Design a protein with these regions (language model features):
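Extracellular/periplasmic helix-exit of transmembrane alpha-helices
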Residues: 99, 209-221, 274-319, 386-393
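Loop-to-transmembrane helix boundary motifs in multi-pass membrane proteins
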Residues: 123-127, 162-170, 275-284, 292, ...
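Helix-loop-helix module between adjacent transmembrane segments
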Residues: 10-11, 15, 56, 90-106, ...
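Hydrophobic, membrane-embedded alpha-helices of multi-pass small-molecule transporters
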Residues: 48-64, 207-215, 224-287, 332-344
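Membrane-interface "cap" regions at the ends of multi-pass membrane proteins
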Residues: 10-66, 268
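Extracellular loop-to-transmembrane helix junctions
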Residues: 1-19, 72-102, 111, 330, ...
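Membrane-interface loop-to-helix entry segments
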Residues: 9-27, 129, 145-149, 165-212, ...
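Hydrophobic alpha-helical segments and their helix-loop junctions in multi-pass secondary transporters
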Residues: 138-156, 163-168, 180, 199-226, ...
């Protein structure tokens, strides 16, 4: 329990102390923001700070800090350390700079930001990468909730069209189209804050349930320092990839520009971007604690939590909420596992529209131009989603790459932020250090993961267990990360700080 409380205190303190250092390094001022300067009534709309925070939290969180934290808890309470320090020194820094770099460049999408600071080649790579990733996220977050709704109807004894995935998938996609098309303050600005509050209440309820029920005890880090994973999966770098949104996530960089286009003042960035990520870290810490404590009494992490997750992540959420909060928890769990993915899915498609708009310089104030991008983006999502619902398309294997690509995107954004700070004559080490660390994480996992090069480099024991090639992956990951840092330092040595803001909307 004390480990959890210490980590919780560090997260809260980190917002004020290290978050203040990050903000001071960036140097927000009183310049006119894109929301005030452009204000097109569609994507550039001034929103109140509390709404900015809640929308940003729900955009970046969804079910990420819940699923990732529960999976991360398989390694034991050591996951508390990554959630805590990863959030403070990497994730929140990443989110702050991805949002503020966008704000300084008139709300540019992350692909355009990468191009400004890392070159034209990286811009094109990031454009394609971002659109594909966002459409994939949006599609999966349409199919998932549709399937859960069907399960609820079938469990209630309902039959017919309302008990089919295709029916609810079409309804979710229609909602996505509307939310992607209309002004951000019409739906997202109105209902997201409510769902954000529900996400926070659900986490608080779980925490209260753990502390008030004597049968649950949160294990201490110092008594369980090491991997407790049932399959013997290494902590490095699997845990760092698995937790994902609970500590750092490149997906957040695609969402931060949405709120960068809605801020009235640059000084709101600390609360909106850094603060939302710290809040997500707290949520992840609570769910990781639930994973470590609720199932330890039923046979230990190796059997209890693994068995719960084997029934599906949504089932695990349902189980945690029912054990900690009873009937109220079940209602919140159902709202969470259905509403939270949907609120991440619609902003994923909205971000895809904006990436394409920035790419092809298509003004989004006119409804015809928005329609021109919404139709193909949602059309591809519909083809993938309906194809999957009908059993014609299986993108499960492709989706397994998401965790790795997600953290690789975070790595790229941190390097872009490092170059930004160099050009601005600021302390670039505040982003270069986590960028180097995430480079090591990304490369190491690419060599270890069975969906990556691990399928060729790993071996199997007689009973089918995987023997990971850590002797190769660990040193190579570190060496490549150091080389990337060396390339960065060599590059800035050859360049001079210079003005670097681009006007995308003239």
């Amino acid at each position: 329990m004390f480990s959890f409380l210490i980590c919780l205190a560090l997260l809260i303190g980190g917002y004020f102390v290290y978050g203040g250092i990050v903000e001071k390094t960036f140097g927000p001022d009183d310049r006119e923001t894109p929301a005030v300067k452009i204000n097109d009534g569609v994507d550039y709309v001034v929103l109140p700070q509390w709404k900015l925070f809640m929308i940003q939290l729900l955009n970046i969180a969804g079910l990420g800090p819940i699923f990732g934290a529960l999976q991360g808890a398989l390694w034991g309470p050591i996951v508390f350390l990554w959630i805590t320090f990863g959030t403070i020194f990497a994730g929140a820094v990443h989110d702050y700079f991805s949002g503020m770099m966008s704000e300084r460049n008139e709300g540019a999408s992350i692909s355009e930001i990468a191009g400004i600071y890392l070159g034209g080649a990286m811009k094109n790579v990031m454009r394609v990468f971002s659109v594909v990733l966002l459409v994939m996220v949006g599609t999966v977050f349409a199919v998932g909730p549709a399937g859960l709704i069907v399960t609820l109807f079938k469990n209630g004894g309902h039959e017919g069209i309302v008990a089919t995935t295709l029916f609810w998938l079409i309804i979710v996609l229609v909602y996505y189209f509307i939310a992607t098309f209309i002004s951000i303050d019409k739906i997202i600005g109105k209902i997201y804050p409510l769902f954000g509050i529900c996400l926070i209440i659900m986490a608080i309820g779980v925490a209260v349930g753990i502390f008030t029920k004597p049968e649950y005890t949160i294990p201490e880090i110092w008594n369980n320092f090491g991997s407790m994973h049932p399959s013997g999966t290494p902590v490095w770098s699997f845990m760092f990839i698995t937790v994902a949104c609970g500590a750092i996530s490149g997906f957040h960089a695609t969402q931060s520009p949405l709120m960068a286009r809605c801020m009235k003042s640059e000084k709101q960035g600390h609360f909106v971007f850094y603060g939302a990520m710290v809040c997500e870290g707290v949520i992840a810490l609570i769910w990781a604690a639930a994973g470590c404590s609720l199932y330890e009494v039923t046979g230990g992490l190796n059997t209890g939590l693994a068995a719960a997750l084997a029934n599906g992540q949504s089932a695990a959420i349902y189980d945690v909420c029912s054990k900690t909060m009873g009937g109220v928890g079940i209602a919140l769990a159902m709202l969470g596992v259905i509403a939270c993915p949907i609120t991440s899915g619609d902003t994923a498609f909205r971000s895809a529209r904006l990436v394409l708009a920035d790419w092809f310089k298509i003004d989004q104030k006119k409804w015809q131009n928005r329609l021109m991008l919404c139709v193909p983006v949602l059309g591809v999502g519909a083809i993938l989603g309906i194809g999957n619902a009908l059993g014609k398309i299986d993108y499960t294997v492709i989706w397994r790459y998401f965790s790795w690509t997600n953290q690789t995107l975070a790595m790229i954004v941190l390097w872009a932020a490092s170059m930004y700070l160099f050009y601005d004559k600021k302390n670039y080490w505040i982003t270069a250090v986590p960028a180097t660390f995430m480079s090591a994480v990304s490369v190491t996992y690419f060599l270890l993961g069975n969906e990556c090069l691990g399928q060729f480099l790993n071996t199997k024991t007689a009973d089918g267990a995987t023997v990971y090639n850590t002797a190769v992956a660990y040193p190579v990951g570190v060496i490549v990360a150091v080389l990337v840092l060396g390339i960065f330092l060599y590059t800035i040595k050859k360049r001079n700080p210079q003005p670097h803001y681009e006007t995308l909307h003239k």
